[in-house]
Amino acid sequence: MICRDAVETDLAEIVAIYNASIPSRLATADLEPVSFESRQAWFHQHSPSNRPIWVMEVDRAIAGWLSFQSFYGRPAYHATAEISIYVAPAYRRCGVARQLLSQAIHHSPALGLKTLLGFIFAHNQPSLQLFNSFGFQRWGYLPAVAELDGVERDIIIMGKRIRQER
């Protein structure tokens, strides 16, 4: 497995992996597939030196991706980022998400990050278990904030401090 910065030519595969996650209703509140065009601005908001998007390659195929997103976008939150991880169906349960999350934690200090957050549906047990296994703790609970196919779903906010202030 090779983790690298995403480049614009990866965007079509990033979108395809994201769209493949929608039908399960586990990982995103989007209900319909998103378009390549609708994700171009999102892609360009990321920077390899600040809020990167990484892809994980397995045998030259993109098996999954991770993005860092600014938390609330206000200056006082500059050292906090939300992370999102999506894995292609063929590569789920193969360690791709684990490798991406490990890399995110390891590289966070170099990105100026002290806190990582994950907003995870309460019924997404695989993701909750993954984040727990890396020492993330439950920092918040948002009851019934999403409605997926007529079912109200809760969000759990998982957090981890990466380095303490001196």
List each language-model region with its residue ranges:
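A short beta-loop-alpha structural element at the N-terminal edge
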Residues: I2-I14
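Acetyl-CoA-dependent GNAT
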Residues: E8, E32-A90, L101-S102, R161-R163
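Conserved GNAT-fold acetyl-CoA-binding loop/helix
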Residues: V15-W42
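Glycine-rich acetyl-CoA-binding "A-motif" of GNAT/NAT acetyltransferases
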Residues: A61-W65, P126, E152
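Conserved catalytic-core motifs of GNAT/GCN5-like acyltransferases
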Residues: S70, P75, L117-I120, Q137-D154
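Conserved acetyl-CoA-binding loop-helix of GNAT-fold acetyltransferases
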Residues: V87, R93-H106, L128-S133
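Conserved beta-strand-loop-alpha-helix junction that forms the acyl-donor binding cleft
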Residues: R92, G118-L128
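Conserved GNAT acetyl-CoA-binding A-motif
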Residues: S108-I120
